[in-house]
């Protein structure tokens, strides 16, 4: 009986879901912005909506690319990173967190001018970065299987969430 209830519910919901997906307009290319000299590959992207900047983890260059979306050009490249993979702008702390796979560190930059304000050592393969705006926390996947919970005010790891494998994306 439960199986039939689930099938009935799915059949009623399915047209609404597929209709919503097909009713929206397709994406339209508005502009192309060359990233400049990036050797190797890029990884995750972050966005600073306030300043209209795209943040590009340039893993192959060991740098962070900063793109001015309003002007449609690269503003700068921040060197000295170690295989940056994850990047996120943290609006409630006006800072940028960059996770580095090469040395397992997280570099923290001031949002206004992207100058360094801190560094958090996670030990191994820091990767993806996510922002929890409800709890005012930053989450960074790292190592063989963990999420570091970071307080963006004290710039310290306050907890670990253990996982069964490396969190490539979450």
Segments from the language model and where they lie:
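Bacterial N-terminal signal peptides that target proteins for export
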Residues: 1-6, 16
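Predominantly soluble domains enriched in secretory-pathway, periplasmic, or organellar proteins
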Residues: 12, 17-170
């Amino acid at each position: 009986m439960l199986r039939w209830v689930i099938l009935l519910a799915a059949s009623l919901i399915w047209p609404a879901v597929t209709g919503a997906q097909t009713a929206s307009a397709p994406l339209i290319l508005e502009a192309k912005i060359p990233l400049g000299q990036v050797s190797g590959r890029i990884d995750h992207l972050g966005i600073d909506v306030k300043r209209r900047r795209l943040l590009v983890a340039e893993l192959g260059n060991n740098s962070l690319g900063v793109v001015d979306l309003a002007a449609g050009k690269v503003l700068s490249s921040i060197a000295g990173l170690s295989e940056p993979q994850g990047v996120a702008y943290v609006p409630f702390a006006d800072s940028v967190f960059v996770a580095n796979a090469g040395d397992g560190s997280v570099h923290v930059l001031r949002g206004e001018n992207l100058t360094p304000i801190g560094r958090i050592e996670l030990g191994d393969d820091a990767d993806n970065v996510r922002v929890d705006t409800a709890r005012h926390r930053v989450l960074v996947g790292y190592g063989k299987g963990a999420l570091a919970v970071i307080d963006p005010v004290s710039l310290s790891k306050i907890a670990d969430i253990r996982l069964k494998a490396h969190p490539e994306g979450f």
